[in-house]
Amino acid sequence: MKSVFAFAFVCLPLAALAQDGIPNPYGAPQHQWASPASGAWGSSAGIERGPRGEIWAIDRCGANSCDGSDHGPIVQLDLATGKAIKSIGAGLFVFPHGLHVDRRGNVWVTDGAISKDGSKGLQVTQLSPDGKVLMTLGVAGQRGNDETHFQSPSDVITAPNGDIFVADGHAAIQPFIPANLNMRVMKFDSQGRFITQWGKPGARYSEFNNPHALGLDSKGRLYVADRGNNRTQIFDQGGKFVAEWKQFGRPSGFYITGDRLYAIDADSSEANHPGGWKKGVWIGSISEAKAEAFVPDEQAGEGVVVAPDGNMYGAVNVVPRGITKYPKQASREKRS
């Protein structure tokens, strides 16, 4: 823990975050690489790797919503061909947004919108790999800010002991965020019982503006993609603030393996961060709190994962919607 607090309050100036000349260990992005089960890939905000190396991704039913669709929006991909092996979750979701595969291979999905008839949406659902519903959190079609409701859950992740963390607050309104919007992280035990929560609208430590994605490192620290505030916030699992990082862009999604952090930036622009970052994927060392590589992509997505073969994949929610493949070029990566 000593190394954690050594970097807890480090915020690097933009001059230290130069993107020109930083190593890029991947080849040119291959957009619309995969073929979905629905025939035409819809918006995708999530892509995840399971415990056996399997890759799952979100396909919003060939559109940007699954309301009224009979397609299964959670797709397992064959990395050799880019084709769908199977799809699950048909009829369960309206706006599948956050995706997580736990240590047993079960698939977790957050649903960020309400169906037209008000009967579905705004829940977190755990599915077996075959699509059986194992658990749901939240009340279908009902917004709220108490312990049993969500306003717009954006992501979910589970700890090794089974505890569940949910980012609730898929909205980014600047420069002012209405006080009645949920901008929080909620924690539940493995049975779905509420434990605690933290966060509120704002830009100070432990405050959020669109907590868009979650990650856990090897030491159990929780990473929150505080996208509307152009930063990553790090906490212990009880909600105690540990660090603020601004050297990994305006993050929409994370992939963490060992000491490596991959943070995908789908949202940076002159409008929301003048003179700042470009869109793409930041890669770096967690222990050194340092961005060491950058993969530029003006069509970067909101989810990112690295497959067992070393290739990286992104989930893209806008044109060109679908899955992007970034082929690994190991010889080009430089370590410091």
Give, region by region, the residue ranges found by the protein language model.
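Sequence-structural signature of mature extracellular/luminal beta-sheet repeat domains
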Residues: 17-336
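Bacterial N-terminal signal peptides
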Residues: 6-15
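Positively charged n-region of N-terminal signal peptides that target proteins for export
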Residues: 1-4
